[in-house]
Amino acid sequence: EGIDVSKKKILNCLNAKHHYISPNNFYSLRECSNYESLDFIYSKNLINTSKFHRILISEWFKFCKLGGKIIIEIQPNKLLNFDELIKECKLLLKNKINILFMEKNILVLEKKKNYLKKKDSINCWSFGIITDGQREDWLENEINSIISLKIPHFEILICGPYNGEKRNVVKIVQFKSDKPLICAKKNLICKNAKYENICITHNKFIFNKNWYTGMKKYGNYFEILSCKIQDHDRTRAGDWITYGSKWDKISKIGLMNYMDWDKYGYLDGGLYILKKSVWKSVPWNSKLLWGEGEDLDISRRFYENGYVSRINIFSICNTLKWNHGKFKLFEFNNQKLGKIKHSCNYPIWYLKQLIKKYLLRRKING
């Protein structure tokens, strides 16, 4: 059984159904196929009709069975040419594929490794909470919200001072430093995590009662995720954002439409959902302190190493503190990052961030 995902039906063989989906960040074949079930996936002149080629490649791999084939025909354009397609497939899929054919703008891939690691299950989770010992009531509320999810197998790892109630599911990860080394703390949590599915937060989040149900609806086939994050008044609190320009340029940070995606998109440092195997490949830079752009750094390295960050809109977390105000929204554009109009106080906000980073590092270094 296979599927033709081209915009217009090309294949006429009996075992190939046609299912076209307009490419965007929501692209998935989950409504028409089971994961890792298809003998082949065929696409003609779809891969570079938009900027979402990384999402298409990743999704096709998820639904192709072991030994199955992914056949991509491409009409080269300014978004992606044939050589770039081959390079992207190698980067994204790594050692999980064999290239069977690559001539005349036709690429044929064979899947040789399953997507999920052994024992990886949506019913098994390691939650990590970074704390500095303050706001103990917030920390207890977050712990209780996780326990209330009633996940079959889970643990809660706390890195930082904790004097709360002793519970079997709560484990303390020792960290001996007064410096705000949040990246080192996140690495310690991931190192000690029992399960492949990890969710790391700062101690300021409450998990919505349907968070776990939303994760099951999204599915276990992901690398790095954000979920919806809401402020006290239910406005978006940095849940799906982009730097808005090249990493070495002055930022134009703003929110993205949930169905949008950008190569300079990044996840705010307060919450990450990721696989332990991804962390092993791309750990946090332990030398970076809070406020030194550690979220930008790891998001850039995720992208450069071929991991695709997405957002799960079926799950919600509420933040008890959001310091960055309301970001403007980029307009959706399937070819490039859309337009945004920043409010007049944006340069002031950006300058404050630079000053805060400088003063923090100066204080720590004496």
Where do the language-model regions lie?
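A short glycine-rich, Lys/Arg-flanked "PGG" loop and its adjoining helix->strand segment in the class I
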Residues: 54-66
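Short, acidic, metal-binding catalytic loop of nucleotide-sugar glycosyltransferases
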Residues: 141-153
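Short aromatic/hydrophobic "clamp" motif used to bind/position activated sugar donors
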Residues: 198
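Conserved donor NDP-sugar-binding/catalytic core segment of glycosyltransferases
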Residues: 212-245
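A recurrent flexible, glycine/aromatic-enriched loop bordering the glycosyltransferase active site
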Residues: 253-274
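Donor nucleotide-sugar recognition loop
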Residues: 269, 281-300, 304-311, 316-317
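Active-site donor/metal-binding and catalytic loop motifs
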Residues: 311-331
